[in-house]
Amino acid sequence: MEMNIGDMVAAMAARNEAFRGNEQVPEKVEAYNKLKEHAAAIGKVLRAPWYADDLELWEQNTFVYIDFPLPVNILNDSIRGRIAEMVRLADMVTLAEVRGRLRMTFTVARVWKE
């Protein structure tokens, strides 16, 4: 499902406190699981911390992030390929500086159906 920028921002900003997912969207869960696999592999090779949010029934969206030490120079073709695949899998990618590191956050939106 293609999402435009407005849809992505709305999906992330609108937190429905009453939301209770009752059915996972299989393709979204598959994307999330692949993101976790890639993050774990990158984290292991680069010794970079990473985190994967849990698939919670009350959260429509989930994310995986990796914290790269600055400056970031990635020469390894395999790592670059994994990052490119993560960008392709995610509905939204956010880059931010967090405590002297580059955090790449890969968000999967609408993981649950109500």
Regions found by a protein language model. Name each.
Residues 2-16:
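Short linear clamp-binding motif
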Residues 3, 7, 22-37, 74-81:
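Alpha-helix boundary/N-cap detector
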Residues 15-51:
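N-proximal, solvent-exposed amphipathic alpha-helical segments enriched in charged/polar residues
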Residues 18, 50-74:
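Short glycine-rich, basic-tinged beta-strand/loop micro-motifs
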Residues 71, 81, 109-110:
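Intrinsically disordered, low-complexity serine/threonine-rich segments
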Residues 77-94:
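Short, non-transmembrane amphipathic alpha-helical segments
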Residues 93-114:
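C-terminal edge-of-domain segments
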